[in-house]
């Protein structure tokens, strides 16, 4: 699967269809959910779900709910990350952050609602009918593990606790693995699970996801010091302002670029665990490593 306009349109339509009706008393909440969920972005995680599903012989129909669920989790995390009690960022994807439009109270609840909607989407009658009970249950287990206290949320806690501490590289590695790589890793595994893949394929996809996930975060650190707010669609330089350690502050830009290249090659090598054509995923990994926004 390539990141074509048709693919992007299918993802956007699927996400919209998952949202509750806006004809209700809690319309402001639904508006806030839609505001962030439909704000665009790279859609890396659903793309990986669809790509690994296809690689394992699945169908777009079987991948849709899994792709939507992981993007809902990602979107809720961004809403919460931007709150004043967290990163206190006013800009996301080139638009005012959710709490700047709807208020902190509704933004908090919109994030909570997207979190719960993700698991409803994975386990509703339609998804179970398409993918089977076993795949849906395993999907819930994988997504909750990688998004929870020992995954994405745990990474955010380490991030908060690392402010003004000059955290060493070991802490940074753990934080970035949990905060960023875990959900990308989950997306790769979910794509395989939705297609009924075997454990060997899931393990290979997991390794690919972990490598590009960490590379993705290192590239983010590079862009945070080499790009502008307008180019990235979000504030840059906030890590330095909050005295947070980053790969760039600890290792320098050139070493970071070397690490991104090494991790990307390792990710591509992990794809050798599949019998199908992995060319598009390989190209995607290289493109992600060279992104400028």
Regions found by a protein language model. Give the residues of each.
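Double-stranded RNA-binding/processing signature
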Residues: 1-4
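Mg2+-dependent prenyl diphosphate-binding active-site environment of isoprenoid biosynthetic enzymes
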Residues: 6, 10, 19, 23-271, ...
């Amino acid at each position: 699967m390539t990141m074509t306009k048709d693919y992007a349109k299918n993802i956007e339509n699927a996400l919209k269809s998952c949202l509750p009706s806006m004809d209700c008393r809690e319309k402001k909440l639904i508006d806030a959910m839609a505001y962030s969920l439909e704000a665009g972005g790279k859609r890396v995680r659903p793309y990986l779900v669809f790509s690994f599903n296809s690689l394992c012989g699945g169908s777009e129909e079987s991948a849709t709910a899994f792709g939507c669920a992981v993007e809902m989790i990602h979107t809720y995390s961004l809403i919460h990350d931007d709150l004043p009690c967290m990163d206190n960022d006013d800009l996301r994807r080139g638009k005012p952050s959710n709490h700047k439009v709807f208020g902190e109270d509704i933004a908090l609840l919109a994030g909570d609602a997207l979190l719960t909607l993700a698991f409803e989407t994975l386990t509703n009658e339609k998804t179970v009918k398409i993918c089977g009970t076993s795949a849906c249950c395993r999907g819930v287990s994988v997504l909750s593990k990688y998004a929870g206290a020992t995954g994405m949320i745990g990474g955010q806690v380490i991030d908060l606790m690392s402010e003004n501490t000059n955290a060493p590289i070991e802490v940074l590695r753990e934080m970035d693995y949990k905060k960023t790589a875990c959900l990308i890793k989950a997306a790769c595994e979910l794509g395989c699970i939705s297609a009924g893949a075997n454990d060997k394929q899931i393990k290979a996809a997991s390794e690919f996801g972990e490598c590009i996930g960490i590379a993705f975060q290192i590239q983010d650190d590079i862009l945070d010091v080499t790009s502008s707010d307008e180019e990235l669609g979000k504030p840059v330089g906030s890590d330095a302002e909050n005295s947070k350690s980053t790969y760039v502050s600890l290792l320098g830009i050139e070493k970071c670029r070397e690490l991104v290249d090494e991790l990307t090659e390792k990710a591509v090598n992990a794809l050798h665990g599949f019998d199908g054509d992995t060319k598009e995923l390989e190209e995607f990994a290289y493109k992600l490593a060279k992104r400028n926004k």
